[in-house]
UniProtKB/Swiss-Prot annotation:
PROSITE patterns: DNAA
Upper classification of the organism: Bacteria, Bacillati, Bacillota, Bacilli, Bacillales
Protein's name according to its UniProt entry: Chromosomal replication initiator protein DnaA
Intracellular or extracellular location(s): Cytoplasm
Record keywords, A-Z: ATP-binding, Cytoplasm, DNA replication, DNA-binding, Lipid-binding, Nucleotide-binding
InterPro entries hit by this protein: AAA+_ATPase (IPR003593), Chromosome_initiator_DnaA (IPR001957), Chromosome_initiator_DnaA-like (IPR020591), Chromosome_initiator_DnaA_CS (IPR018312), DnaA_C (IPR013159), DnaA_dom (IPR013317), DnaA_N_dom (IPR024633), DnaA_N_sf (IPR038454)
Protein family (similarity comment): Belongs to the DnaA family.
Free-text domain note: Domain I is involved in oligomerization and binding regulators, domain II is flexibile and of varying length in different bacteria, domain III forms the AAA+ region, while domain IV binds dsDNA.
Chief place where the protein resides: cytoplasm
Function: Plays an essential role in the initiation and regulation of chromosomal replication. ATP-DnaA binds to the origin of replication (oriC) to initiate formation of the DNA replication initiation complex once per cell cycle. Binds the DnaA box (a 9 base pair repeat at the origin) and separates the double-stranded (ds)DNA. Forms a right-handed helical filament on oriC DNA; dsDNA binds to the exterior of the filament while single-stranded (ss)DNA is stabiized in the filament's interior.
SMART domains on file: AAA, Bac_DnaA_C
Amino acid sequence: MENIADLWNSALTELEKKVSKPSYETWLKSTKAHALKKDTLTIIAPNEFARDWLESHYSELISETIYDITGAKLNIRFIIPQSQTEEEVDYPPAKAKKMNDESNHLPQSMLNPKYTFDTFVIGSGNRFAHAASLAVAEAPAKAYNPLFIYGGVGLGKTHLMHAIGHYVIEHNPNAKVVYLSSEKFTNEFINSIRDNKAVDFRNKYRNVDVLLIDDIQFLAGKEQTQEEFFHTFNALHEESKQIVISSDRPPKEIPTLEDRLRSRFEWGLITDITPPDLETRIAILRKKAKAEGLDIPNEVMIYIANQIDSNIRELEGALIRVVAYSSLINKDINADLAAEALKDIIPNSKPKIISIYDIQKAVGDVYQVKLEDFKAKKRTKSVAFPRQIAMYLSRELTDSSLPKIGEEFGGRDHTTVIHAHEKISRLLKTDTQLQKQIEEINDILK
């Protein structure tokens, strides 16, 4: 039982990285391992509602996570405390998907059926990434190759990658589509060397029509894996096969990434996804509620959207937490109940959200620069230096991408923003006067 407990604790550690904080704390944190018999792992859920939700929403993810840890394909069964002694037949386990499927595309467990273009909510922060993804899906290797999508956690990068895979398979069932994380690519590569199966590994990933690889930033520092992926990339690109890559940052900001690999990522199109605005967050909640068959008052969705502005995963997790809380205490959902359900994950006083406009105004006040001059083409020192400071602070104090910052400064290139950030960072190490001026600007922004 101790080994089972260790296995489940390891699984929970990995699952915590894959789901939102509200989802993890609501559904997974309170679960415990009960038994491992033959090919079935039995997990204890705290109540019947949680058991049913875990069964329908997390079985496949848990099975895949266990497989990544152990290499074993286990079925997952959920029980509630009073049913621990019941026969297996009462609640049949969720069948694990076959990981060695020999069909042209991966098993459905690897492409989430919920992640399609139809279920993707388009907003100002993801409109271009969505359009680029759809173009790639409609004409693989002809529109943008590679397509590099970057942005923060839980903003929809993985959703778009799965959507591309689904679209390609739907319109060409014979297409060989592979989706995986860079971590899985690394693990399989290491295992192939250990087991003397490097040729099989290369054949697997160099003979596909579409390669979708998630979280490429985790290749940083892994020299041998980068070497292998470099040759995989070349082989696919030379054969006009589509490559789609996601990361939490643009190629130029991935540390210890080989220059030759970075340059190849820049061959095609690089597009970012930024956090959704209020209208998009409300639309996301409405679509989620409809998909799950939930009747949620509009005031509750507006309340949640105003409180959770970090990413989509946290947003949807908060909605499900409210629904679960309502079910457990048997009360109707309203704004007060939502506030009670989310009190542990919403800070009492949310920090002020600083915009690029706020920064430009504050820097302008300190350096006597007009707002319009930040976007103008003026290069006089009296304007150029404050502009660089404003770019530096925009990078430090906002979640805006490099292209977005450049756009707010008169459509300047993202490399200009990088240069400004590097220059001010360097000066701050020795220039005490600049340190005081930055401190003054920060005081204004508080």
